[in-house]
Amino acid sequence: MSKPTIYIAAGHGGNDPGAVSGKYIEKALTLKTALACQNYLRNYECETVMARTTDKSCTVAYKMEEVEKKRPSLVLEIHYNAGGGEGCEVYYWHTHAPSKSLAQKVLAEMVKLGQKSRGIKESKAGTSYNFGMCRQAATTGIPSILGEYAFVDNAKDQAKINSDAKLRAVGEAYAKAAVSYLGLKKKAVEPAKPSGGGSAGAIAVGSTVKVSGAKYATGQTLSLI
């Protein structure tokens, strides 16, 4: 049985910087967040597909085509906001209930980081929120959301994204929502293999060992039976 696949899309890229306010450049913020999301998911029984892993151009049309071709289990489109507001919001296609459920989980994880909630919002045709990556859910049936964690031009929000550690936490929030939505299990941890072919913790007969205490001299060869 194939593993669930999560498509992670960092918004903008290349010659499209997205929202910019001083040192806060959306394309860079989204990439760091997306990579952190992928890294967290490496611990779970799933596959990830990245729209981009470097600062390259990545159009909405390209991402929609990739989703259509690869048929992932869900889509996480990562963005940051601008325009003077404050807080986080998550968009979903207004007629797609599974996407709404995913949006609720993503928003809940964002709020756990201490961010102000602006709620989940509908993406629909005929509005300025007609997002392609949300819209494709209606044709593919794949749960898809577009998240906006913070406003790059708001001082309070800037304080929540001003370090790699904080961006990593945002990426992990997206990942945790995906884990919850898909019911993913952690990968089994393989026990470490002992070096030299022996059993872990075993001492070969005739080995020279150091023993603390008065009974044996340090470095003395012991006869082990």
PLM region spans:
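Short glycine-rich His-centered loop
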Residues: 3-23
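Short, solvent-exposed loop/turn elements at domain surfaces
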Residues: 16-19, 155, 217-221
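A broadly conserved detector of short glycine/acidic/proline-rich loop/turn motifs that flank catalytic sites
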Residues: 12, 150-151, 215
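Beta-loop motif signature
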Residues: 196-225
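A residue-level detector for conformationally permissive "hinge/kink" positions
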Residues: 3-6, 10, 142, 169, ...
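Active-site-proximal helix/loop segments of hydrolytic enzymes
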Residues: 3-6, 24, 28-193
